[in-house]
Amino acid sequence: MSLQAPKGTKDLLPTESYKWQYLENKFRNIAADFGCREIRTPVFEYTELFQRGVGETTDVVQKEMYTFEDKAGRSITLKPEGTSPAVRAFVEGRLFNETQPTKMYYFTPVMRYENVQKGRLRQHHQFGIEIFGAKDASVDAEVISIPVGIYKELGVEGVELNINSIGCPKCRKTYNEALKKYLSKNYDKLCSTCKTRFDKNPLRILDCKVDTCKEIVKDAPIILDYICDECKDHFESLKSYLDVLDIKYKVDPFIVRGLDYYSKTVFEFIIDDITICAGGRYDYLIEEIGGPSMPAVGFGMGIERLLLTLQEKAIEIPEEAYVDLYLGNIGDKAKLEVLKLAKELRDRHIKCEIDHMGKSVKAQMKYANRIGAKYSMVLGEEELNTGKVSLKRMEDGKQIEVDIKEIDTLIKVFK
């Protein structure tokens, strides 16, 4: 029996990788426009990081993490999200001693043991932005504007932005009491997981995906009615900044996000009832992980879901030719010359392909066409004797004669 990739994973083949490269380059350029620099963190962390950061009562920690003991008996988890590792690196690297804010971006695989579904695999990939050290709502608006710009540049229409404030620990305590009072009337109808959450973290019940629980929370108290003046002012400021930036949004008081580290601002970008990007503020996570008290805000965007959206919207990602010149040859002597010529051109960063298979000229040209080469030429005995060769533009068949030794002339064609 042939081996297959594990369930919930997918190989990225050369026929698809150009799409990822295109998006990654676009993300990098946009992140740089906002002053963000790249961070890379390990694919696994100590389990405690996610227990403390994401939250013991969350579905991520309770049900979805890939956790195991290493040979030294330490509990290790494949990272299920990108923010906690970025914060851990920020603290461990003592970047809080630098002038703030610190702006980071990353591309990372994340692993969650969950049902494989449309646009979500057990190993999927995220593009994320994290900004540390700024508490003003203007940075929340700036972070939100990044996905807005990405979707606009890609031509994705119909994306809705939903925002909410879940307050701070002080005002959330008051809300939790009101929420528990409401939920107690239907306690027996809650799922077993939410019954556990009832005492430990009732806010998580608002995020439950079980139909009976979703029905119960429809008439639950609105958290915006309970947030303190400071959190209220922050949320009103955010809305004002979004208005100034001409970013349309809807206030959804039931957005709480599935991770415990969020405070104040939370947001989701939704298209066709699917969340394709989400984030918020996490002003207490840095301190929770061992750093100083410092505000932060960020988001994560699923790359697979974005690619699926582009496909459904019939938005094509341009595929650049990955070969500038196909160098064909006839005979062993010509092959030696082609090898030397290819080396000279590659040294000048011209992408070349040559024949290693001993194919006929017809088969070589067929291959050149299949790989999307921009130009082709074939060296044989006649070309070696005259020092001249026909350079063919594959797009329209137009040919020009060039001197084999005039490398600079060839370079000009490709530049």
Curated annotation (Swiss-Prot):
This is Histidine--tRNA ligase. NCBIfam families: hisS. It is found in: Cytoplasm. Homodimer. Keywords: Aminoacyl-tRNA synthetase, ATP-binding, Cytoplasm, Ligase, Nucleotide-binding, Protein biosynthesis. The keyword Repeat does not apply. InterPro entries: aa-tRNA-synth_II (IPR006195), aa-tRNA-synth_II/BPL/LPL (IPR045864), Anticodon-bd (IPR004154), Anticodon-bd_dom_sf (IPR036621), His-tRNA-ligase (IPR015807), HisRS-like_core (IPR041715), HisRS/HisZ (IPR004516), HisRS_anticodon (IPR033656).
